[in-house]
């Protein structure tokens, strides 16, 4: 009886929302794209650890005497060259082996995002219909109370179904 009641109450909510026009301002659920193994591989290939150092310049090129010319004779000047220690990479670790783990994590995240999007869509339908019902002058409060009671029964039946006590 519990599953039938849940389905009936959800159909009641959808029908009620259709009747009062609650769908007009509600956007459909935004379901994210399905994760692919290629995207997990791309993410994993971007994770690397490199141990070493870049080129280090101890001192730059210094000009002590600039080039000059006297009476037609050109002198090159005096320049001390820079001293640079070359860069060294000791080792580099690539974490591309994490691709299967990232792929599974992406699927878990996708499932939760999809469920949350659909549940928020259903909640928007319900709150939209209740909001429109409550604005009806005479019957609005009574209809709103009825809808809320019916939906509390829905929540109670869902809890009973999840707990397994039929």
Swiss-Prot record:
Xref: Pfam families: C166
Protein name (record): Uncharacterized protein C-166
Function: This protein may be involved in virus assembly. Essential for virus function.
């Amino acid at each position: 009886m519990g599953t039938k009641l849940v389905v009936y109450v959800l159909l009641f909510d959808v029908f009620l929302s259709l009747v009062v026009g609650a769908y007009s301002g509600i956007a459909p659920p935004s379901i994210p794209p399905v994760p692919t193994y290629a995207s997990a591989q791309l993410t994993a290939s971007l994770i690397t650890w490199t141990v070493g150092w870049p080129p280090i310049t101890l001192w730059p090129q210094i000009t002590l005497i600039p080039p000059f010319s006297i009476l037609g004779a050109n002198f090159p000047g005096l320049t001390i060259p820079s001293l640079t220690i070359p860069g060294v990479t000791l080792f580099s670790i690539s974490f591309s082996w994490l691709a299967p783990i990232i792929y599974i994590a992406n699927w878990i995240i996708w499932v939760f995002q999809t469920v949350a999007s659909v549940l928020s869509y259903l909640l928007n339908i319900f709150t939209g219909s209740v909001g429109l019902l409550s604005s009806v002058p005479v019957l609005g409060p009574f209809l709103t109370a009825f809808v809320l009671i019916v939906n509390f029964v829905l929540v109670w039946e869902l809890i009973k179904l999840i707990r397994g006590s039929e």
